[in-house]
């Protein structure tokens, strides 16, 4: 089967880029995949979309559309699979890709909490247009599922992010005391960094390790000595540092289905995460503590709840089991393959 995948590749690293690499590995020998790379370029690659300059963005859009149209005109594509963050500029590009799809079978994959992204009349209209045109829409969580259902009658599937089975730890050695808590991701206000800093003022016996590119807005905040900023690290470096921690803290204000949180679960770490996106569905009530967004007090209380070694050991064991049973890459990839074949059945039968 020939698949045209419209999706970012690293650099820079990110949730969708990691997903794309994983998909290409799993597709090897199964699908013939043609990839159109939608990754940020220039300053946007360095600042993860914070700075948008018109000319570089026009150049990027032209390059993406040029590659997309060339593949469509030179290859007999069976399925177009578009990965999207549903951002303001991204949804416009996605709509253009859909408009030029030439009646090809289409899977639109939303890597976000859709209702948090499609704000405003134009974005909503573009989203509805794409949903109606797609053969199937993939979403990450229940809220996004309901949102698409409210706009379109298109088939909707909840497809979780996945992790390579060889990256799932066989076991995790739980320390006697809770001394090191790690956060991995963009270090900015909307990721709950201010709340981490405030919680650290109360939990002085714990070190908070913050790994990821640091926004200017955070650099101006005075933080206590037990908060350590590491800046941007490679994926391998970040994962190595994560595995040395006693717990993973993820107080983001909004989320789809966090790859880094999935990686923390696969490492066997107990989780403290906000009730946004798929976070609560992932750890349920046994893999960690779910807290309200923008509450340093709840972070402090959650930390106290997981201090006992026995509690953290049970959470670790449960998270490893959950990842193995629900998020292995081979199982998730099989679901995607099944959808491809379902939407292409009429064509295959006519052949």
Label each residue range with its predicted role.
Residues 311-326:
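A short, well-ordered alpha-helix in the C-terminal region of glycosyltransferases
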Residues 253:
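Aromatic "clamp/platform" in nucleotide-sugar-dependent glycosyltransferases that forms part
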Residues 218-236:
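Nucleotide-activated donor-binding/catalytic signature segment of Leloir-type glycosyltransferases, i.e.
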Residues 132-169:
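Donor nucleotide-sugar binding/catalytic pocket of nucleotide-sugar-dependent glycosyltransferases
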Residues 285, 289-296, 305-310:
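Conserved acidic donor-binding segment of nucleotide-sugar-dependent glycosyltransferases
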